[in-house]
Amino acid sequence: MITKIDSLPKDLIRKVENGEKLLPNQEIVYFEEKTVPYKIRSDEESFPLGKLITLLVTSQSFILFDEEQNSGWKIPYETITLHAKQSKDKPYVYVQLEGEAIRPLLDHILKFERSSGTLHEAPSTEDENEFTDDFLELTLYVTDVDSCYQALCTCQSLHPDTFSSDNDVENASMGNPMSLFFDPNHQWVTAENVDTSACDNRFDSPESPVLKWHRTE
């Protein structure tokens, strides 16, 4: 489940010395960047460009935090169904969240000030429309796109989707042709990355992520 936080975790490990032993529950920072502009889109609404947030990719979770508001979210990797990058034009990292576990974040977004697109909460109203699907897209305009994307690849591989893994085994045993479009790390295989590594998904055109990437589940 996505967790709302009012401060960044204080026990984050930002540097690991050679030979240092770590406990399984310790949270290692693989990527960190402050003042990241972002955009949010649900299945029904697209919000304006948001103000700056702190982004952390750790061994345990994907963290978005607004230091001005002392408010943020710890997002488990199991809720991330797709991540990709665009390296041309205006570079960004794209993250797609899906599933019932993201409901707290979706409900919170309904209280955003839509006129400014910030993380400031606006008073709730009785006639607010509910989201029809637990689906959310994040576009993060990080400075170092490659490092952020690689960190996401690494950390998400530490938290494999058990349900998807079971489906992959079943698809392979049944000869399902759709299994040919996934690699073992659950990355989308396209014409752009078929001859490259599993973590080489990217947007290199101005096309919308929704148009360029198609889900098959």
Swiss-Prot record:
Which function does this protein serve?
Chaperone that regulates the assembly of spliceosomal U1, U2, U4 and U5 small nuclear ribonucleoproteins (snRNPs), the building blocks of the spliceosome, and thereby plays an important role in the splicing of cellular pre-mRNAs. Most spliceosomal snRNPs contain a common set of Sm proteins smb1, smd1, smd2, smd3, sme1, smf1 and smg1 that assemble in a heptameric protein ring on the Sm site of the small nuclear RNA to form the core snRNP.
The record's subcellular locations are: Nucleus; Cytoplasm
- Provide the alphabetized UniProt keywords: Cytoplasm, mRNA processing, mRNA splicing, Nucleus
Q: List the disulfide bonds.
A: none
What Gene Ontology biological process does one annotation of this record name?
A: spliceosomal snRNP assembly
Subunit and partners: Interacts with smd1; the interaction is direct. Interacts with smd3; the interaction is direct.
Gene null: resulting phenotype = Decreases cellular levels of Sm-class snRNPs and leads to abnormal splicing of a subset of introns. Decreases vegetative cell population growth and leads to heat sensitivity.
Which protein family is named in the record?
Belongs to the pICln (TC 1.A.47) family.
Q: Which GO terms describe its cellular component?
A: cytoplasm; cytosol; nucleus; pICln-Sm protein complex; spliceosomal complex
> One short Pfam family name for this protein?
Voldacs
Could you read off the lineage of the organism from its UniProt record? Answer: Eukaryota, Fungi, Dikarya, Ascomycota, Taphrinomycotina
Q: What is the name of this protein?
A: Splicing factor saf5
